[in-house]
A protein has these predicted regions:
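Long, histidine/aromatic-enriched segments associated with O2/redox biology
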Residues: 3-180
Length: 180
């Protein structure tokens, strides 16, 4: 299991990336949920070194391949002795970082039994993200979609978008801004 991070870590970043700036949904957020199947039998047969290169992070610590700790900055310019990028050009973490935007995200594991036709385990991630505009998510997905090595091991099965209403002020009610 890989540690999953690269979320906004400071209050200002939530304002910049997560909470809607104005209109009836000011201080609300967009929530996108995806069900992502992992072809676990293939992934489990993949060597640890290739798994880490696929993510661009170390499996145990979650650190970038150029760091030691989970929250160390990625050095996207670092090259090894043969002149290759330490974090490969098709690594998931590199590509997500290069999209030049941020979202609040979290993934939860799921298991849904086995496929009746193939006998393969139906397992993966329920990916949940929060962002001030759905375009942030779209930009990241477009950047990942064309080059991400992780796509060899996953299939997106379902997706939904929701709006999370802003909080309620004292004496107010949920959705009040929608009707004002």
């Amino acid at each position: 299991v890989y540690k999953r991070q690269v979320n906004p870590r400071h209050t200002d970043e939530y304002k910049d990336y997560v909470f809607i700036d104005d209109g009836w949904a000011k201080n609300g957020t967009y929530c996108i949920i995806r069900r992502i199947q992992i072809h676990i039998e293939t992934w489990d047969r993949t060597a640890l070194e290739e798994q880490e290169a696929t993510f661009g992070r170390k499996r145990i610590s979650g650190a970038p391949l150029t760091g030691k700790k989970e929250f160390d900055e990625m050095d996207l310019d670092a090259k090894d002795s043969s002149g290759e990028y330490v974090i490969p050009a098709d690594a998931h973490a590199r590509l997500a970082h290069e999209a030049k935007t941020s979202i609040k995200r979290r993934a939860y594991n799921y298991t849904a039994g086995t496929n009746d036709k193939t006998g393969a385990l139906e397992t993966g991630l329920l990916f949940i993200s929060f962002q001030k505009a759905t375009q942030q998510f779209i930009d990241i997905q477009n950047h990942l979609g064309h080059k991400d090595k992780l796509n060899e091991y996953i299939t997106h099965r379902a997706s939904a978008t929701f709006i999370v209403l802003p909080g309620v002020k004292k004496g107010g009610y949920l959705g009040e801004t929608l009707f004002d």
